[in-house]
Regions:
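Membrane-helix boundary/helix-loop-helix interface segments in multi-pass membrane proteins
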Residues: 2-40, 46-181, 346-361, 365, ...
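Loop-to-helix entry and N-terminal half of a specific, functionally important transmembrane alpha helix
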Residues: 319-357, 363
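Hydrophobic, glycine- and aromatic-enriched re-entrant/interface helices and adjoining loop segments
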Residues: 116-122, 127-130, 209-303, 322-330
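Transmembrane alpha-helix boundary/anchor motif
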Residues: 79, 87, 144, 219, ...
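Interfacial segments of multi-pass membrane proteins
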Residues: 149, 187-206, 274-300, 359-374
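Hydrophobic alpha-helical segments of polytopic membrane proteins
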Residues: 97-98, 104, 160-178, 183-224
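Hydrophobic alpha-helical transmembrane segments
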Residues: 72-80, 295-315
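Alpha-helical transmembrane segments of multi-pass membrane proteins, especially transporters
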Residues: 135, 143, 161-166, 189, ...
Length: 388
């Protein structure tokens, strides 16, 4: 006897879904600002490839020894930019003080590191290169100032709220950086802090008082500087008359001015710099702008300046349309930091101010600086999305 088998219906195939990363749908970031950042990164890498080739070949036997790690840092930095642009920037309310505490610990730790060119600015990480704590300190100062101002904006005219906490933070950070010594970084952080305090509503009388005190402090420092800070005194003397010591402290400035003068209107052409062949001691770092002027001329120099001006202008525009005060202050802090650092670097290269050792954002060799910079630009893009 045959038993009929129960016929089961053929199951329908389950629909196949494409794998997607669990990311939120966010408003679009500001495209003009992103394009400016990417243009500066690309321009900087091209100029670093040219400016560093000779010194890299001489020092390390590899013409791309400075470019290769910078490409890696740029890639990591762009990933950081993308991630930061997708993070709700309000999280930095909670991270501001812990990051400042971390930066202070690192600024103390760096004082126990070996000297390089008369300074102690880098923490050596075996197998991972170096870390510059001042870059983290700049980031932390912007976060802390933006956080404090945004929650106390209606009391910023009072000394105990609008001056004292900021003066304490700047005083501690500046003192630690001066011990390295890192004069340019100190000036930069003081400048960033002053701008944020002014934008945040600190009373004008306190700025006048600070200005008078600053002039008095500088006057006193000029008198006692040779005994107190020989490093700064040497830089000041070489600025006033670099040709007094053409083979010593004035050598870098003189060779930089030669490079700028050689460029003329249109430059010698990309890759054709003569001064990068061991005449300018640090063509891949603080003095890369002189190589830009030599190879690309006045036109190329104006293009670099124009990009930084546009970045600042776009940042101010984004700050004006930010969803809240905290976001606006973050954008102002980070874009002013880039612009002010670029101005200080170009002023040093052209001998307008003493050589204080400050890099050109997006152009100079340096992994910590580039990655932190791109992370900061990511925060600006996060604010530009307009989410409250």
């Amino acid at each position: 006897m045959l038993h009929s088998e129960t016929i089961r219906p053929t199951p329908r195939p389950t629909p196949r879904h494409r794998f997607r990363l669990p990311l939120r749908q966010l408003p679009a970031m500001d495209l003009p600002f992103l394009v400016l950042v990417l243009t500066l990164v690309g321009f900087g890498l091209v100029m670093l490839a040219s400016a560093s080739s000779a010194v890299a070949l001489y020092r390390r036997g590899d013409a791309w020894a400075y470019l290769r790690p910078q490409l890696l840092y740029a890639a990591l930095g762009l990933v950081g930019l993308w991630l930061a642009s997708r993070v709700d920037y309000h999280i930095f309310h909670k991270l501001a003080w812990p990051l400042l505490a971390l930066s202070l610990v690192l600024l103390v730790a760096v004082l126990f590191m070996p000297e390089y060119n008369g300074c102690k600015r880098w923490l050596v990480r075996p197998g991972l290169g170096t870390l510059q704590p001042s870059e983290i300190a700049k980031f932390a100062v912007v976060l802390v100032f933006s956080h404090v101002i945004s929650i106390n904006h209606d009391q910023m005219k009072r000394f105990s709220v609008g001056v004292l906490p900021f003066a304490l933070v700047l005083g501690v950070v500046a003192a630690l950086m001066l011990l390295e010594p890192h004069l340019s970084g100190t000036l930069l952080i003081l400048g960033i802090g002053a701008v944020l305090m002014f934008v945040g509503g600190t009373g004008l009388k306190w700025f006048v008082l600070a200005g008078v005190s600053g002039v008095a402090a500088i006057g006193a420092a000029v008198v006692i500087m040779p005994d107190l800070v020989p490093y700064a005194a040497d830089r000041l003397n070489s600025w006033l008359d670099p040709f007094a010591d053409p083979l010593g402290d004035g050598h870098q400035t003189i060779q930089s001015l030669y490079a700028i003068g050689s460029g003329g209107a249109a430059g010698l052409g990309l890759g054709n710099s003569r001064q990068k062949h061991l005449f300018v001691p640090e063509p891949q770092n603080d003095f890369i702008f002189s190589i830009v002027c030599e190879e690309l001329g006045f036109v190329g120099a104006c293009a670099v300046v124009g990009l930084f001006v546009l970045l600042l202008w776009r940042g101010i525009t984004l700050a004006a349309h930010a969803p809240d005060r905290f976001g606006a202050l973050l954008v102002v802090g980070f874009t002013v930091q880039v612009a002010l650092q670029a101005v200080l670097n170009m002023a040093v290269v052209t001998n307008t101010i003493p050589n204080t050792g400050i890099s050109l954002p997006f152009f100079s060799s340096g992994g910590t600086s580039l990655m932190m910079l791109l992370g900061e630009m990511g925060v600006v893009l996060s604010v530009s999305r307009g989410e409250t």
